[in-house]
Amino acid sequence: MMTETMPIHTGAGASPVRRLVMFWTTAGALAAIAVLPYAIALNPALLERVGMPIPLLVFAQFAKAFVQLALLSWAGLRLGHAIGLGSPLAQALAYRKPAFSLPGTTLALAAVAGAVMGALLPMLDRLFLPFMPGAAPSAPTAIDLWKRVLASFYGGITEELICRLFLMTLIVWICWKFASHKGAPPRAWMIWSGIVGASLVFGIGHLPAASGVWPLTAAVIARTLVLNGLGGIAFGWLYWRRGLEHAVLAHFAADIVVHVIGGS
């Protein structure tokens, strides 16, 4: 079932969609700076490499993320409106929908599903270890708990805005635009093309980091795509069936398990 959408106005009365864009853009940009303490703890040379004081780095990170996410969120919401994908909970609040009620049960299930995914991924990672080239990577750096908690917001919010709200929506919209009868909703294969396509792109985006640890053998590539793609498929399904908020919560819960409980 496609998520319920409400009209997105583009003229003078466009304040609700502007509020939606502003809400998600601000949340994503704040998450982009929240990950900085974790990133610096993981790679202390980062500060030396960027060559700027921390306050300036925070401002630059926020400004860059804000501009990028504003464009991506606006595009994702606009395209998603045509195909039944979007952010129904935030949209209902923006429109002050009188009959709105928070779907606590499905949100809780999304959080549980994300936590289960976060617990399964390290187990799946162990299956790849016998096939990985060279020595195993060194033990992870001990990072303060609060830094790991903050880092989880980046995955839950910023990555979902990029991968689900924008990228998955764009892929589905392209398939729908060129392969569907006018006025017909997207078919299942179009939705799944978006889910899998966005997950693959997300996994491919992690290959440069993997290449810093191992040579890019078939096993390394498979591990990178599988571990990063499986979560994306689950989050994409939630985005399709329940809306962006459910995907955000599930991704956040998965990262809490991986980073906070798992300590990675």
Briefly describe each language-model feature range.
Residues 72-88, 166-173:
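Membrane-water interface of transmembrane alpha-helices
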Residues 86-158, 173-185:
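Juxtamembrane helix-loop-helix connectors linking adjacent transmembrane helices
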Residues 145-264:
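Transmembrane helix-loop-helix hairpins at the membrane interface
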